[in-house]
């Protein structure tokens, strides 16, 4: 594996073996042009067994229906045999001839199923800034760069059109994934809007503290991402009494929504959203 730009932390052996197995499986099933890594593994904040494994497999042409079925089987087999990292694989399958438009949807695999979604400006910027090349051409050879204006517009639209309305659905925020992504996305978006840079999830925790996020939320998030693997994340790690354990998800949801609403509004107002 080589970096598209600077060298990063070594890939954990089990994840490296998984990537080799996945690459071989792709080469046997689809017309593979390149395989790239982005997200936490490429950015240097990867927590094996906890982080998603974010990949882009560039195809020489669109996958056929038969190839889509083959990809589904490959992902299911990896998830059954490859451990936690394999179950966390998210992979986009764009056609190399259709990479110009950041809004265009491409075949992908996430959350245990095939779907279609865009290769977003944030993903594209990650690939150019710190993407890892597992196979084939690097991003610079085939992936158009996004402008700062495109990146800013996407980040603002994501906050305004997705995350702010999501706060109107209290049940969403009872789940770890919504709490984590909502908080981390706000912090990372704020930094990107401020200076154009991309930060890791670990760095986002410090940003959230500076934005006034409640300490119990940050302790809970930090524990689930970085705490001892044998210790179940929960309210004890977040400074909440054990007697309140059953009530913590609801309390955490309230804290998260109460913080995120005004914080998102301030960020949108500060960076030019009308």
Where are these predicted regions, by residue range?
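Conserved NTP/Mg2+-binding pocket subregion across the NTase superfamily
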Residues: 2-7, 72-175, 183, 189
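Short secondary-structure boundary/capping segments within folded domains
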Residues: 26-28, 43-48, 83
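Catalytic metal-binding acidic patch
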Residues: 39-77, 88-93
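Short, solvent-exposed polar/charged micro-motifs at secondary-structure junctions
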Residues: 44-47, 99-104, 229
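Nucleotidyltransferase catalytic cores
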Residues: 131, 137-274
